[in-house]
């Protein structure tokens, strides 16, 4: 019984572990040289590995065919390599269970060009007049094409009785062929799906009839100098003998003073001028057949000036090649090199190869003047080239550790020699030193520090370099510190009477100095005064403590220094009467009282509306009284504002502020007489106004506190790590900018179903405008799966207000996750708001049924990643026009412009990469968001903290702290630039995902400089990867920098 239960348990486990395919590969059409994909998915992918077989054998990843996730991706289908059946094998690594899909294969459509060959007779020599000639076209393809024959560029018309065409045999049969059938024969094929091609090596039929004129001597093209004679030889043969004539510019040539036609058919031209040059025709006429025309060209010899050379500096002990551009000339000039009027040999350590001067290993003895000569019948030209050989510098005097005295000039020597004067650069703590008021670098490389300071005591490096290389030396500077006060004591200091006061004195030197205080007059310090470690302490200041005191700092090697301080005993300023806020009627008198006491007696000064009131420049109605009060007569509204009383003596200053409020006198009170200048009603009115203002402020602060607390609770619930939302994110979530929320309530209303009825109606009207009928979509193919669901290509009727069909990208929402649904709506809202040539447009939404669809703009070449990979392919039949540096800069500039528009709209992408940009055949790039993280580009995403993230494109703050911003998009843009210049390579390809994550945490992971990438653009990438987001450039700066970048600058 127990055995039976165990067996049933094993069967149950086996039933649960059964592998079931969700998607299987199916047979399909494919074009040779174009991309394709075979898909394979299981319902439960946990612990399942995938393997692909071709004809039963495992497939190894190559550049053209590789596994992407569980799918088999073909960058370029090959009709030979990819023939046969493919099968997907899914294997559970825990249970060992294995399942296989049915076989699938490609129906590969292709076209291969070929030549036209003679099938009958066996050789061209056997062709006789009136015989049968059969030609065969060697163009083939699948599906089988249709053929057409041509002679001398014209298609052979149907229905002629002199020839027949066989499509089955791909042949052209000429019956009774004669001289009239002579010509160049070729064929073309028109397949059903691939495009038309023409034959490459074609057949020329030339049947000879004795009555037709035949060329015996063919005139040859001639190049002569001016006033030289030219002779064209021409002779024909036929039975009976043919007649012959010469034409120049289609005019017959007769015997004249400068042209002679001889009996044997030759033409002589004497004293050739420019007007004599051109095409000459020798024409033979036979009894039968067409006239035979032979052409020859007469040209004058000429040679242009040579382009001058720039002096060259070549590195010693290395191989070098110097080219001499051949000047244009007729005939083509001969080029050679000379040195010291001797021709450079064609072999040896220094030799000439074609038009190049070659140094196998250049030495200093090879420096000098080399001359490039070019000559033909028209004459000779030459240009001189100065070559300097650069050697690596050698030390004359290396930098040495030095002791420099503070506040005096100091020198560090760096003397070297080389064949070229070395360039000397000094570094301080690894940072290059630029010449300024403190540092000077002399012509021999010596560094002068004009005024040595204590912090100059550090490590210095000198680099001496030439084009051949560099040497470097180090020196540590020890500063001999002078004996000095740090800081020097203030010469006049105040002490508050009857208080405990300390006066400090500190000094430094080569040795720690001893510090003492004495009275300057030599008398001893009072008993209530003590000093210790440079601090002079007065336990209770008395009047007698005023006087001069001297601080003495000394050490044994440097002696002593002194500083005298005058101490003044004073009573600090205090206010007896302070100005108070005052409210008066317009036209009345206002008075601010201000009295202060201290010793010395304080001086009172007033400041009105941030300006000092000078008694000598005041208006007559404004007076400062002897007791310090400020009186303003006949006040106006312009007198309203802040007034400050400033009281000070030689030891301290204090101030107090008060406001003057000027109000209009009520009309009813103006008739009550002088006794009503300060009525109770005015005080009551002011009190009510102030009370209302205070109540308003309290209510606002209370509401702000309540809202902030509510938002914080909501934020903590939504963001467990406490980050604050800020801007819209393309892929969901909200972001932080400067620690403050931005447009939080507005965006919440715009992107959810909450809000007032009027707001809801506006949103519904906008959404109705974006509605797109699901019935107008016709699915073409699935591109892959992302977080939201399946992404596919479709034909859309009436898209973009067009009558015809358009190719569109459709993203489906197939998830029940509320956060992902919100992210889907946010993405649609974002693309609906953006309108830029380098950003894809939202064309419509399908929401009348599930799943919801987002219909986006699509372009013909697909995503930028695949485009870059194909452009790097070694298969010449696949590769489009090669990508130059100019093209790569253009691609990056367009992405920067699109992202500039996106960031200006306060959006953040969060997944910017080449895979998420689209490119057209015209190489126009558009920022999109395919995000095929589930299959096609699964290897470019990493599962981290319950989410799939593009780890290799993200900055540390986004990965580790979940802080996304425009500056995190800038980091991703730098990686995208790296992808463009490596043509689709994976960032950090040698590293596993865990190693990349560890590198981001430590800050040590760096992407290498792409091969052939200009240094200026490499520095721009490095700016994008600055550790601190605030140090990264904006997209506007990036677009401007790329727009100004010289496309062909050297790396």
Curated annotation (Swiss-Prot):
State the superkingdom: Eukaryota
Specify the Ig-like C2-type domain's residue ranges: 23-105, 115-204, 213-298, 308-388, 393-472, 487-566, 573-661
Topology Cytoplasmic: residue spans: 707-1051
* GO biological process annotation, one example: regulation of canonical Wnt signaling pathway
Q: What is known of its domains?
A: The protein kinase domain is predicted to be catalytically inactive.
The stretch of residues making up the signal peptide is 1-22
Where found? Membrane
Q: Name one GO molecular function term.
A: axon guidance receptor activity
Swiss-Prot/TrEMBL keywords = Cell adhesion, Disulfide bond, Glycoprotein, Immunoglobulin domain, Membrane, Receptor, Repeat, Signal, Transmembrane, Transmembrane helix, Wnt signaling pathway
Q: Which residues are glycosylated?
A: 103, 202, 255, 264, 444, 548, 627
What tissue specificity does the UniProt entry give?
Answer: Expressed in bone marrow, spleen, bursa, thymus and brain. Weakly expressed in fibroblasts. Also expressed in embryonic liver.
**Which cysteines bridge via disulfide bonds?**
40-88, 137-187, 234-282, 326-372, 414-462, 505-551, 594-645
Q: Where are the transmembrane segments?
A: 686-706
For this protein, the record's InterPro entries field holds: Cell_Adh-Cytoskel_Orgn, Ig-like_dom, Ig-like_dom_sf, Ig-like_fold, Ig_I-set, Ig_sub, Ig_sub2, Kinase-like_dom_sf
Q: Which residues form the Protein kinase domain?
A: 777-1048
Q: What does this protein do?
A: Inactive tyrosine kinase involved in Wnt signaling. pathway.
List the membrane topology term(s): Single-pass type I membrane protein
Write down what this protein is called.
Inactive tyrosine-protein kinase 7
